[in-house]
Amino acid sequence: MHYLLQRPAASVDPDAGLLLAEHFQMAYVTTDIERACELFRSRLGIRRFARLEGQLVAGGHIRTELAWVGSIMYELISASGPGSELYMARLPQGQGFAMRHHHLGFLLQSRQQWDAMIAKTMRLGWSIPYRNDNPLVEVCFVDAPELGHYLEYFLPKQAGLDFFNGVPRH
C-alpha cells in the first residue's frame, strides 16, 4: 500500500520522552470479546484476528484478539479472575457490553532503550503496574495518568517478532 503522507521513521529515544518509540499498537478492553470482535468485523472492516490467550500471572484468564491495519495493530482484550484488574478496572461495572481504550503499544529495539524507558518512567514518578519477561517479549505497562490510559512497551524476542508477523493483515 502506498501512503499519501510521508511518514518518518520513529525517533526512538525513550530517555527524551516516553512517546519517542515505535508506536505500533492500539488496544481496547471489553466486557464481551465476541461482541467486540463482531463490532470490528461488521462496522470497522477488520474481519480476521489472531487469538492469544492463557493464564495471568496471578491466576486469572486473559484473551486477546489481534489484527493489523497498515502499520497499526489493533488489540481487543478481555480478562477475568485474579490479576484481571489491570485490564478491566477502567470499564463501567454492571452495564452490559462496554469497550474502552486501554493502551498504546510501543516497540523498543534494544536493552539500552528498555533501560532508558524504565529510568524515564521512574524520574516522572509514574508507576509500572505490570512487568513480565516471557518467551515472546519482555513487556511492561506504564500508567500515564494524565493521558487516562497505559503505555505498553515491548522488547521483542525473535519468537515475538515471528508471532506479530503472523497476525492477520487487512
Where are these regions (language model features)?
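Vicinal oxygen chelate
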Residues: 1-16, 23-31, 65-70, 74-75, 91-113, 118-170
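N-terminal beta-strand motif that seeds the catalytic metal site of vicinal oxygen chelate
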Residues: 2-37, 99-106, 165-170
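N-terminal strand-loop-strand beta-hairpin
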Residues: 3-5, 12-13, 22-28, 43-69
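A cross-kingdom feature marking solvent-exposed beta-strand/loop segments within repeated
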Residues: 12-13, 48-61, 83-94, 134-137, ...
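Amphipathic alpha-helical segments
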Residues: 32-48, 116-124
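Hydrophobic, ordered structural segments
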Residues: 82-84, 94, 105, 109-113, ...
